[in-house]
Swiss-Prot record:
Belongs to the acyl carrier protein (ACP) family. The gene is acpP. GO terms for cellular component: cytosol; membrane. It comes from Gluconacetobacter diazotrophicus (strain ATCC 49037 / DSM 5601 / CCUG 37298 / CIP 103539 / LMG 7603 / PAl5). Gene3D superfamilies: ACP-like. Carrier of the growing fatty acid chain in fatty acid biosynthesis. This is Acyl carrier protein. GO terms for molecular function: acyl binding; acyl carrier activity. InterPro entries: ACP, ACP-like_sf, PP-bd_ACP, Ppantetheine_attach_site.
Amino acid sequence: MSEIADKVKKIVVEHLGVEESKVTPEASFIDDLGADSLDTVELVMAFEEAFSVEIPEDAAEKIATVKDAIDYIEKQKAA
């Protein structure tokens, strides 16, 4: 697992209070991890701060799973 993936996983565990084992790439923040819309906004803000990236609202709406977040951040960091 990449450094970005590890950090995303840690942020999700801290913000949603879920077990680390439940935070898989395919896990949906809302359906699998019990997040609500406010939680997802807070996660996006945490990702922006932790990785020094900007995630516009239209992109944030498409980030539904752990893998979506990792992929988006990796693309931004590579740009």
